[in-house]
């Protein structure tokens, strides 16, 4: 339990940020899962479209502080190379 008003406020803010960041992470994971599913089905057009949709979401996560930029770059790079390798 927070002992000062300042600590209580920080605790409230942390809960609020946690909920917002959790929703953002979930949304980004959904976009990435759509790319994975398209790759698994072998549909290059669908995979490319899903990748194009996922990139701005991933970068938005970086700008909002949900992911480190290197993490997002690594994910994009790996997915891009897998989409490129499709027939």
Curated annotation (Swiss-Prot):
Residue ranges that the Swiss-Prot or TrEMBL entry lists as coiled coil: none
Entry function: Binds directly to 16S ribosomal RNA.
UniProt similarity note: Belongs to the bacterial ribosomal protein bS20 family.
Name of this protein: Small ribosomal subunit protein bS20
Alphabetical list of InterPro entries matching this protein: Ribosomal_bS20, Ribosomal_bS20_sf
A Pfam family of this chain: Ribosomal_S20p
Species classification: Bacteria, Pseudomonadati, Pseudomonadota, Alphaproteobacteria, Rhodobacterales
Segments of this protein annotated with the region Disordered: 1-22, 65-87
GO biological process assignments: translation
Highest taxon, organism lineage: Bacteria
SUPFAM superfamilies linked to this entry: Ribosomal protein S20
């Amino acid at each position: 339990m927070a002992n000062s008003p300042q600590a209580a406020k920080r605790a409230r803010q942390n809960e609020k940020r946690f909920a917002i960041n959790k929703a953002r992470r979930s949304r980004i994971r959904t976009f990435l899962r759509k790319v994975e599913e398209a790759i698994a089905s072998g549909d290059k057009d669908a995979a490319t479209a899903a990748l194009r949709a996922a990139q701005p979401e991933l970068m938005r996560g970086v700008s909002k502080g949900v992911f480190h930029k290197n993490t997002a770059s690594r994910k994009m790079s790996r997915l891009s190379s897998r989409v490129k390798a499709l027939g």
